[in-house]
C-alpha cells in the first residue's frame, strides 16, 4: 500500500493541512499546481523520526514554506508542530487526521 493510500484511501485528490489541493498523480511534481511531497511533521533536524507516524502528505509549496521549522507561516496563518494528544476528539487538526501520528500541526494565534 502506498503512503497516499494509507493517508487518503482511494481518493484521487485531497487537501493538505493548509487547505492546498493535491492530486494523487502529482507526487514530486514541483511545477504542478497540485504537486505534493512527503513531509516530516517534526523535522529530522529537530529530533523527528523517519517513520510513517512522523510523516504527512503536503503540497510542494507547503513543504517548501514549512521547511525544517516547528513554528511557521503559510498564507499569513501561523502554524506550530505539537505533540499529538491521542484522544479521539483531538486527533483532527486543520481537517487532517493525526490519530496515527506522534505530532500534529495546529493553527495558532499570531
Residue ranges and their predicted role:
Residues 1-28:
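Short, charged surface segments at domain edges that flank catalytic/cofactor-binding sites
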Residues 5, 57-60:
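Generic alpha-helical structural context detector
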Residues 23-58, 66-71:
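Histidine-centered nuclease catalytic patch
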Residues 9, 63-65:
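Acidic glycine-/aspartate-rich tracts in secreted/extracellular proteins
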Residues 47-53, 65-110:
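Polybasic, low-complexity binding patches
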Amino acid at each position: 500500500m502506498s503512503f497516499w493510500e494509507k493517508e487518503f484511501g482511494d481518493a484521487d485528490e485531497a487537501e493538505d493541512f493548509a487547505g492546498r489541493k493535491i492530486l494523487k498523480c502529482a507526487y514530486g511534481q514541483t511545477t504542478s499546481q497540485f504537486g505534493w511531497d512527503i513531509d516530516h511533521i517534526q523535522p529530522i533536524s529537530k529530533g523527528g523520526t523517519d517513520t510513517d507516524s512522523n510523516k504527512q502528505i503536503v503540497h510542494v509549496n507547503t513543504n517548501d514554506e514549512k521547511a525544517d521549522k516547528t513554528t511557521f507561516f503559510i498564507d499569513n496563518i501561523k502554524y506550530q508542530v505539537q505533540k499529538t494528544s491521542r484522544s479521539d476528539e483531538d486527533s483532527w487538526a486543520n481537517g487532517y487526521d493525526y490519530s496515527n501520528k506522534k505530532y500534529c500541526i495546529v493553527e495558532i494565534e499570531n
